[in-house]
Amino acid sequence: MAIHSFETMGTMVSIRIADAELGEHTTDDRAIAVLNEIEHEFARLNEKYSLYRDDSEISAVARGDISLADASEELREEYARALEWREKTDGAFTPHRPDGIIDLSGTIKAVAIESAAKQLTDAGFVNFSVNVGGDLTTSGNQAADESGWITGIVDPQDRGTVISAVRLNAEFPAMATSGSVERGEHIWLRPETTKDFVQATVIAQDIITADVLATAIISGGQATLDQITQNFAVAVMTVSPDGTLQANPLFQELVAQ
């Protein structure tokens, strides 16, 4: 298995390709080429959408140096996508900070993961995982004698403890966890929402859906959780401040045995 890691977007990216081998004496030129392309795309998206960079396009929009109407077509399309998710979640997910600044970090990381998976598929790889700060998408199998990919979910109160392990498969290959474990507090609660959950994990058919809905659950609390489990075919597990776990039936079906 080829394993490649690098830092970007304030977190760690880990790519595992079960179809390839990388080492000091054996190399896979196809894997090396696509991994370089993936790093480049992550860097490009970070340079374009990071509000921590003064030279990013999104920062220029935030400062008013350019209007949204004059921004690149790609940025406007990503903003439109985020607005669609705000509509689908009744506002629990939003591309706006409390001060009104457009912040697309809630979708861009997932966009980068999705792009990496497409690049790997286009390069001919079938069995791989792309993990970015605990959010991941998978394809195929982890090993010849394994079905799907097994991944753990950490305890938000003790990062050295795994509270559950699930098997991602062809129907539900993507998983995202929101809360304060991997990257600190970064989600804005609705004014009327108490902090019902300190962590939410969503498993879905694609990483963008998983990431957005996990964020929405943290932001919107129990009411949003109920809405999502009724309206979306996703697996969900939440952790309350007192450590109580909630998992819907679909999540329980994916728990690794």
Question: What would you call each of these model-derived segments?
Answer:
Residues 1-257:
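Mature catalytic core of soluble alpha/beta enzymes
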